[in-house]
Amino acid sequence: MAEEVKFSPYEDAVAGLVVQILGRTGIAGEVTQVKIKILEGRDKGRVLTRNVKGPVRLGDIVMLRETEREARRITAR
């Protein structure tokens, strides 16, 4: 009998700590732009700007699939 292999969606994810909330973005304000400090992995200690969908507050831990991309700054038109 073959052994079943289960893949977790967080298998390759890296933990990051929300250190600052920059503002809301998106057409209806459904996305929050935050600064995240990487807690583990190759980029440990690096601070990224990312967009987070859903509720988020200071001190939350978010799981990032990759740590290469950064969000563009929110600019007023």
Curated annotation (Swiss-Prot):
Annotated InterPro entries: NA-bd_OB-fold, Ribosomal_eS28, Ribosomal_eS28_CS
GO biological process: maturation of SSU-rRNA; ribosomal small subunit assembly; translation
Entry's Gene Ontology cellular component terms: cytosolic small ribosomal subunit
UniProt entry keywords in alphabetical sequence: Ribonucleoprotein, Ribosomal protein
Keyword Ribosomal protein: yes
Family, as annotated: Belongs to the eukaryotic ribosomal protein eS28 family.
Entry protein name: Small ribosomal subunit protein eS28
Native organism: Pyrobaculum aerophilum (strain ATCC 51768 / DSM 7523 / JCM 9630 / CIP 104966 / NBRC 100827 / IM2)
Gene name for this UniProt entry: rps28e
